[in-house]
Structures are given as C-alpha cells and as structure tokens.
C-alpha cells in the first residue's frame, strides 16, 4: 500500500495550512524533527535507505514544506486536490489501461504509426517502466531524484529540491508582473503547471539495487518523464491550460519549432491516456498547433524551468571533484568508482549538502 511510504509525524511550525489540507484528504508528510541539522557521519555509517537520507536533510525538508505550502496556495479547491493527489500517488493511474501485452502492443503501434516513437531506441517491452501493482507506488515523490547521473539533482530527494526551485522562480515572475504590470491573474495555472512538470519522475527514475536509477528515454522527441506526466494529467482530467503549461515546462515556447515539439508531446501523451487532444481543447482544430490565444501561464512556466542548466553543470563538476577525493584521500582506483559505497557517498553528499554548494 502507498501509505507504507508515508509518515504521520508533521511539523507544527512549518507550512501549517498545507499540513491541515494534507491531513484533511489523507496525505501526510514524512516525519522530521524540528531541530534537523547537518551532522557528521563516517563513510562506513552513511545511510543507504532512501527515506532515511531524505528525512535527515534540512534542504529537502525545507523544499518539501515549501511545495506543500504552494499546493495549498492554489485557490481552486478542485485543482488543489488534484495536484496534491498526484504528489501522494506516484503510480500513474492511466496504467490501468495497460495491464495486458495486447494493450501495450496496441498503444506502442499507435505511437509508432504516428512517428512519435523510435523503434530502434524504445521497444514495446520498454515503453513503460516497471509497475508491479496499480495500488503500490514505485516510490514516494519524496525519494525520487531530479534527473539521472548525467543530468541534475541526482540524489534521493533531488526531485523535491529541483521542483521547489522552479516553483520559486515561477512565483517570483508572477510577483514581478504584479509589481510592474499590476496584475497576477495567472497564478493557479502557472503554479499548478510548474508543480506538475516533473510528476512522472518517481515512475521513470526508479532507484535500483546498485544505487543507480532507471534511465529516461524519448517519446515524441521529448523526455518520457515529461510525456508520461502529461498523460497522467490528461487522464486525471486536469484543466487544459494547466496541462499545456506543464508541457511548456520542459519545452519552452520560444519558436514555431518549439510549438511543434510541444504539440507532438501532447499528441503522444493523449494517445497514451486514451483521449482525443483536439476534443479536449489541448490542440487546435487541425491538431497541428496549440489553441489560440496562447495563455501567458504557458510562457511563465517555460521561462522559469531552467534551473537544470546550472544544476547539471554544477553536479558534473562536483562529481569530478569527489572522484579526486576518492582516489587521493581514500586510495581508490578508477575501477572502484562504481562501487556501491561510492554511489552511497554521492547520494549522501547530494541530499545532505548539495552538489551546488560543492561547486560554488
């Protein structure tokens, strides 16, 4: 059951309204202590359990509380509940459509016939990551990384931190518009779209026994984590403009080429969700462009979703620096750097201290 990944202990002093909302609909926060702080630990005693790493991190705690508070700030009660539900249940509900080999083959062939998938890189068997049961989440939102080893926020809880930074950027843009243009009518669409932009990563990036994660792949020229997330939002009947804003998070709407890429991602997502994107209003009547007029929220989410550029660079540089530490300080060989102990150490540094701080 999904509840076994969640903890009933909550903060009385942080994000109080978010906690009240969460408890009201059955969602509870992982248990932290109010005096959480960075603690010294020997390399032999580094925690390996993902929830243990995330529960002990001040950075992840702050990010998680922030996300809950911003979910609670959404004025629409229906949308607020939908977003919170997707944070609680990271098992894609649309997977109910794909419980047989025949159903998986059918959707795979549809994507293939529409030119939305490359048979050389993605097979029918690998179209969806493993999901043992619809009622068991692949992992909590809370433990997922923000990306793979060669991307960004690659540590347990990285998704929470990455999403929090992007949401902060989105809200900062909205406040700037309020201050300078004297309006902020985009709040619900933009904040919800940004909160959901990486909602499929707990499904896509599943931690393995060797402390690596399953890799992302491409659907319709976009990352599968983005397309799968859009499929889930479509299947759960989220508002059209929230879904399009979510689509623009990974592919900013800067040119006609970008729009074509977003359209392809939405087409693929709708096929997977078993819905008609034109009938839903996600695409124009000819299915070749986004509906007009464009909503400003789409652009706001797109322009505030690029923390990954710096985070990816910082992570790569930090990991290279850590390799030198392993070799010079601990006497390891290059061939030892894939050892579980090394992977555990990198996860610990990322979650407790951050690669950004190492790089700075």
Could you say what each language-model-derived stretch is?
Residues 2-33:
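Classical Sec-dependent N-terminal signal peptides that target proteins to the secretory pathway
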Residues 6, 65-69, 81, 85, ...:
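Polar/charged alpha-helical tracts
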Residues 31-66, 70, 302-360:
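Terminal helices and disordered tails flanking the catalytic cores of nucleotide-processing hydrolases
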Residues 38-214:
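Acidic/His-rich, divalent-metal-binding segments that scaffold phosphate/diphosphate chemistry
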Residues 59, 66-75, 81, 85, ...:
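All-alpha prenyltransferase/terpene-synthase fold signal
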Residues 70-77, 89-104, 114, 180, ...:
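Surface-exposed polar/charged interaction patches
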Residues 146-147, 155, 161-162, 176-320, ...:
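Divalent metal-dependent catalytic cores for phosphoryl transfer on phosphate-bearing substrates
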């Amino acid at each position: 059951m999904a509840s076994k990944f969640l903890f009933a202990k909550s903060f009385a002093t942080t994000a109080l309204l978010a906690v009240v909302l969460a408890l009201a609909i059955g969602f509870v926060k992982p248990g932290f202590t109010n005096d959480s702080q960075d603690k010294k630990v020997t390399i032999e005693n580094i925690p390996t359990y993902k929830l243990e790493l995330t529960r002990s991190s001040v950075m992840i705690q702050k990010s998680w509380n922030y996300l809950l508070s911003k979910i609670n700030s959404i004025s629409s009660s229906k949308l607020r509940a939908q977003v919170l539900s997707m944070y609680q249940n990271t098992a894609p509900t649309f997977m109910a459509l794909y419980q047989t080999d025949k159903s998986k083959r059918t959707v795979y062939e549809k994507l293939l016939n529409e030119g939305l998938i490359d048979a050389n890189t993605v097979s029918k068997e690998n179209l969806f990551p493993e999901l043992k049961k619809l009622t068991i989440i692949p992992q909590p939102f809370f433990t997922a990384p923000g990306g793979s080893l060669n991307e960004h926020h690659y540590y347990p809880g990285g998704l929470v931190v990455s999403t929090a930074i992007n949401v902060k950027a989105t809200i900062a843009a909205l406040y700037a518009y309020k201050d300078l243009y004297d309006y902020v009518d985009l709040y619900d669409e933009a904040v919800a779209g940004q909160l959901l932009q990486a909602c499929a990563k707990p499904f896509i990036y599943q931690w393995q026994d060797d402390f690596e994660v399953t890799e992302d792949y491409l659907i319709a020229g976009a990352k599968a984590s983005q397309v799968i997330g859009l499929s889930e939002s479509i299947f759960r009947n989220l508002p059209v403009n929230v879904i399009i804003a979510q689509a623009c998070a990974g592919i900013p709407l800067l040119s006609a080429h970008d729009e074509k890429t977003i359209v392809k991602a939405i087409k693929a997502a709708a096929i997977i969700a078993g819905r008609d994107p034109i009938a839903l209003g996600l695409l124009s009547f000819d299915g070749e462009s986004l509906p007009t007029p464009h909503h400003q929220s789409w652009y706001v989410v797109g322009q505030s979703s690029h923390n990954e550029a710096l985070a990816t660079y910082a992570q790569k540089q930090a990991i290279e620096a850590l390799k030198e530490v392993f070799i010079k300080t601990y006497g390891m060989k290059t061939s030892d750097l894939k050892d579980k102990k090394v992977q555990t150490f990198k996860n610990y540094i990322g979650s407790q201290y951050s690669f950004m701080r190492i790089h700075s």
